[in-house]
Amino acid sequence: MKKKIGLYWFTFDLRLHDNSLLVDASSFLDELVCLYCRPSVTPFLHHFAQEVTLGRARQKFIDASLCELNDALGQLGQRLWTLDLPPYQALKYAIQYLSVTHLYSDAMAGSDEQSILHKLQDEYPHLVIVQHSVRSLFDESKLPFTLPDLPETFTQFRKCVEGIDIAHPIDAPSRLPPMPKGAQLPTLSSFYFDESALFSGGEWSGLAHCRRYFFSGLASSYKETRNGLDGMAYSTKFSPWLALGCVSPRMIHAMLKQYEQTQGANDSTYWIYFELLWREYFYWYARCYQQRLFRFGGIRNQPPLTSFYAHRFQQWKNGTTPYPIVNACMHQLNHTGYMSNRGRQLVASCLVHELGLDWRYGAAYFETQLIDYDVGSNWGNWQYLAGVGADPRGSRQFNLEKQTQMYDPNHEFIERWQGRDSRAQQDVVDMVGWPITTQQENGDK
């Protein structure tokens, strides 16, 4: 009887707990290979973000998460193989080299990943592709609508799903099939732990953070503090580990319910669930709209009245705009890979309205920098702010001065992140709109 050789493609599901796909693979396969393809800056991303690599903080968080996953796999006699190739090439190589019969993959929200799986299925008709979501609160089969009929707004979605029972998270597999004999693929290189990082990536680190948060009692006051700009205590900070799948939303939901049973439920604990639903909506939003997630005109094909000005975009990225609160937020992002939810709304509003820029440039830059980058949440929320997405009220413009008075009245955040430091501000541009550097102004001496 032919061996069942499986390839598990880890993407945004970097964990063993609450991973039904991995449990299914462990009980069915004879041999297993676990593969991860490192993310890179695609031509599309390079065009809009104007970056050639991912931000340092994001890459470090990914590295730490991979190391923890590799250690966890090692305890079950497995290891994580990595290939520095585009995913399609990496998967194709592994399938051919190892004679893979079954490919396991999370039902990812991104259209690029879905396209890769379709191409592989066409090229290898014998290949059995097993796919289902391990990153969502709800199974697709439990949704009270088909995916093409996804509610047009979050409020409609919330009202549809709030009554659905959420499955309890399952345990990690107790065993995994062995690797194919003689298999030789690149493994993780040595990793330098960055003790200065704001967040430590990985499944164990993520679960520990969630437990600390609920143990602290902060969940009972979350709604009152959630609009803060700086610090660790004002919000849950679950998003970095949720984004890479180091922690499942069902695990957080189970912790939340346990907290409510022991400490009591209130508006704040409900609002944590509300935020999980917001994230859930944009997961299915990305699954539904696919390529329309990245179009200038959004899901309704209604392009906004914005354009692209290279010098303004560089000012925004570097935090040298005329708006101190925006500068402070961008400095925070560039240094830590993280920004508050309120900050993201302000810098997005500034890019679209004050600077008149195509929203996709901001969304793409966020993708390169954010340690909690999630395709649906990032691109869906940018569409929402730009008025080309799920918001029935159209684009949202924030009064930056008023927002500063509300959320940073003493300018402590602005001072800490040097929001008034615009010494690098470029107001002079060349013939194609790029900032002229001091060296260029001096004749490239």
UniProtKB/Swiss-Prot annotation:
Binds 1 FAD per subunit. Binds 1 5,10-methenyltetrahydrofolate (MTHF) per subunit. It holds the Pfam family DNA_photolyase. It comes from the Bacteria. One of its GO terms (biological process) is photoreactive repair. The keyword Repressor applies. Its cofactor is FAD; (6R)-5,10-methylene-5,6,7,8-tetrahydrofolate. GO terms for molecular function: DNA binding; DNA photolyase activity; FAD binding. May have a photoreceptor function. Binds DNA; probably functions as a transcriptional repressor. Belongs to the DNA photolyase class-1 family. This is Cryptochrome DASH.
